[in-house]
């Protein structure tokens, strides 16, 4: 069949897609803080990088700030899922805020490893994107001794003060393949470097990228639901494009362009780890309106991981125990 003669037929859904355990936990922390203490609740940085999620929480009474000086004395403050530096933690405590830490436990694992190895005299090479809040939080665990590399070329430029005790850590939301390539370059220059006991890139990032690798060759176009600030969503689009599939990232269904689907039969659809399923369903509805007949979910890994909530948020304002489950935003369908 001529490409021009192709008509929209089928939507293939990546599995898994959308919310991960760390995002679900972070959103639920804000929701429960609002339930227990009432609005406003202050959140340093966007709780997760998704426009819809942030706007929904704003409507419930969350106020998102970057500077702690914008938070009134005695207020309740939540740290975002990306983590914060030691300096931010210390300042928040000094200002007397009631603090709930929504840092993803997998990011916290990296922070703990950095602190442990630093005491043993290690310097660090961090693979990540300059300016990303997770990178700033991890590098801010120490006053010095962490060298950021964004690509292979950066590996040749860094100048650790010693190489006998050197360890690698990575941003959790990177491209798995890119991180492996940079890690190999680090190992080639510093053969004795200590690599992570377990890969820092999180299970959800790995699973969503693996799903795109399976999905991309089977479709004519791939749509990623995610906000521009979402690192892991951007990596999904880049991965599909690298595999030779036309790929676009949209914040929501309103950003879809009819021209993208001309001459296309099969549409692949996935979502970054901070994008709620309601946005995926809206995109499906829009693509159906353009002519797609069926929707099929691909086989994939079922994620069952749940991260515990802070103890102070397992009860409501009256001291009644709250059920631990998915956030309200996760339940939206």
Swiss-Prot record:
Chain positions recorded as isopentenyl diphosphate binding sites: 49, 82, 132, 230-232, 274
Residues given in the record as (2E)-4-hydroxy-3-methylbut-2-enyl diphosphate binding sites: 49, 82, 132, 172, 230-232, 274
Superkingdom to which the source organism belongs: Bacteria
Cofactor binding notes: Binds 1 [4Fe-4S] cluster per subunit.
GO MF annotations, alphabetized: 4 iron, 4 sulfur cluster binding; 4-hydroxy-3-methylbut-2-enyl diphosphate reductase activity; metal ion binding
Family from the record: Belongs to the IspH family.
Protein name: 4-hydroxy-3-methylbut-2-enyl diphosphate reductase
Organism: Polaromonas sp. (strain JS666 / ATCC BAA-500)
Biological classification of the source: Bacteria, Pseudomonadati, Pseudomonadota, Betaproteobacteria, Burkholderiales
